[in-house]
Amino acid sequence: TKVKSSKKFDYIIIGGGIVGLSTALKLQEADKKVLILEKEKSVALHQSGRNSGVLHSGIYYKPNSFKSNLCIRGRELMLEFLNDNNVPYRLEGKIVVDQDMNNIESLYERSQLLEMSGVKILQETELLDKEPNSKILQGLFVPQAGVVDYKSVAQTMSGIFQDNGGEIEYFQEIVGITEKKDQKTVSSKKDSFTADFLINCAGLFSDKVAKLDGLHPKVKIIPFRGEYYEIRSQKNHLLNNMIYPIADPDLPFLGIHLTKTVDGRIEAGPNAVLAFAREGYTWSKFNLSQTLETISYKGMVKLGRKYIKTGLDEMYRSLNKSAFVKEVNRLIPDIKSEDLVKRPAGVRAQAVSENGELLDDFLFEEGNKSLHVLNAPSPAATASLAIGEYISSKVLN
C-alpha cells in the first residue's frame, strides 16, 4: 500500500458514523488534526442512518451506567447542536406502556431519581387525550423524548468537521494496523495513514478492528437485524407521537414501538432477528464466513440456549407479517396488514460476551495509543456528542 499522504495526523478515527463524527468534532475543538477513515462512499450509511430516529430521554438505563449518564448528557448536547445548526427535530414526548403497573411505577421512580421533570403516570382518560386511537389503559408520559433524523445530523457534523479543516477519506476498508516509534499506521486495501493515536468507532466491525490493533476483546459483535414497516399515509392520523412498550429487562432491545418521524410518517419496529451477515439488511444477505463465526462463538452458543424461544418468536414475526401486525395492534388496534409497507432495515451491532451475556452498557477498551468503542448500541446516537466528549477527555489527557 502506498502512503496516501505524508501529512501526519494527531488522531485517526476509524468509522464515519455519528459516534466517530462526534468524537472528531470534540477533538477538533481542542485544535487537533483529525482524519476519519470510512469504508463506504459517504457517512452514516449503517447504524447511524438506519434507526428509529429517537432522541432518548435516558429513563430506561441503569442509573450511573455509561448509557444513563451519556444519554442524558448527550441529549442536552444534541439539542444544543440541533438548535445551533437548524437541524429539524420534534420534542413532544413519548408514552411508555406496560400491562404491569409495577413496571410503570418503577420507571417513574427512576425518572424521579434522575430528576426528570414532567414525567407522569397517565390513566386511561389522560392517555386517550394524547393518543385517542391507542388501546392503552396505563402508561408513563416522558416529555424529554423526541425525534430527529440522525442521518442528516451526521451529514451536518461531517460538513462542520470538514469546513474546520478535518479530513475524511472514503472507500477505506481497514486491513492492517501497525505501530512504530510511537506512531500508529493504519492501512486500507489501497493506502496507509499515520497518526499519534487511533480511535476505533467502526460499529459493526469494531471488534475486528480491535483485533487488527492487537487487542483480544472479551466480546464479539453479533449483528441483529431490526426490521421496520411504515404505516400508509392514509392512517397517519392514528398516532400523534411515540408509543413504546417497556423493554424486557433481560434483553437490551426495546421491542416493537410506534414512532412518528420528523417528517410525519409513522414507523413500526424494530424487531430483533439474528442477521446472517454483519451488514445483513435482508434475509437473503448471507455471508458464510461471518455466519460461521457467529454461530461457532461460544458466547453465541450460550446465548442461543438461553433465548431460543425469543429468537424463534422474532424470526416468526420477521417472516410472518400478520404476527408483526399483532404486536402493533397491542398499541393501536386500527392498523391492518395492508397498511404496512416495508422500510429499509437496520442492523444493530450488539456485543456478546464469552459467557453469553448481551452486553447492556456501552463498552470502551484502551489499547496502546488507541481507544476502541466495542459496544455502542441504542441510545448511542442520542448520546453521541457525550460519547465524543468522554473519548476526547480520555485521549487528550
For the regions a protein language model found, what residue spans apply to each?
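Glycine-rich FAD pyrophosphate-binding loop
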Residues: 28-50
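Helical element adjacent to the flavin cofactor pocket in flavoenzyme catalytic cores
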Residues: 140-197, 201, 205-208, 383-394
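Flavin-dependent oxidoreductases
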Residues: 22, 177-287
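Flavin-binding catalytic cores
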Residues: 216-218, 235-236, 261-345
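Helix-loop-beta segment of a Rossmann-like dinucleotide-binding subdomain
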Residues: 61, 88-98, 124-164, 183-189, ...
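Dinucleotide-binding Rossmann-like beta1-alpha1 core, especially the glycine-rich loop
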Residues: 53-126, 136, 255-256, 265-267, ...
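N-terminal Rossmann-like FAD-binding beta1-loop-alpha1 element of flavoenzymes
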Residues: 9-36
